[in-house]
Amino acid sequence: MEKTRRKGLCTVFLGFFVLASVAAACAQQLSPKLQDAVGHWQVIDNDKPNGHVDTYLVGGMLFGRVTEVRPGRTPKDVCDKCSGDLKNQLILGMVIMRNFKPDGDIWAGGTVVDPENGKEYKGKIWTLGKDKLSMRGYIGISLLGRTQTWVRIP
């Protein structure tokens, strides 16, 4: 009798755990607008092509890695102006966007590093349809920054 009771309690706890896990996974589903930010992008800076960045998800957060350096750079160039763990790291392959979290229909709360000057900025990211992405980097408040529009690479 006692063994059956324990088995029943274990089944109830296991069922609760599975249900809670499924509920948590469903809660982390991203809207299509947020999902559109994941992909392969041509960076456009001052109306000129400026390298490629792949954006991807890790733990529900958006990150971005340089997959092609800007014109005039070589794949062996490093970020000599960066600080911390990015100091003297190859620009090609560098994770320049980190820890962007969903905030309504945008990604916010993350940081972006400009490998040209080594500076780190707060950032916001939103999509303009499926094939354009806007990245706003700023210091302090969003008004003190600038926005780049990136174009999806098929």
Kindly give the residue locations of the regions a language model identified.
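Central antiparallel beta-sheet cores of small beta-barrel/beta-sandwich binding domains
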Residues: 38, 43-45, 49-116, 120-121
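Short aromatic-glycine motifs in intrinsically disordered, low-complexity regions
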Residues: 81-87, 134-141
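Generic beta-strand structural signal
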Residues: 57, 102, 127-128, 152
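N-terminal helix-cap/turn-to-beta initiation motif at the start of protein domains
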Residues: 28-40
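Acidic, glycine-rich flexible loop segments
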Residues: 112-131, 136
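Edge beta-strand at a domain terminus
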Residues: 130-132, 139-154
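Bacterial N-terminal signal peptides
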Residues: 11-21
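Bacterial N-terminal signal peptides that target proteins for export
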Residues: 2-13
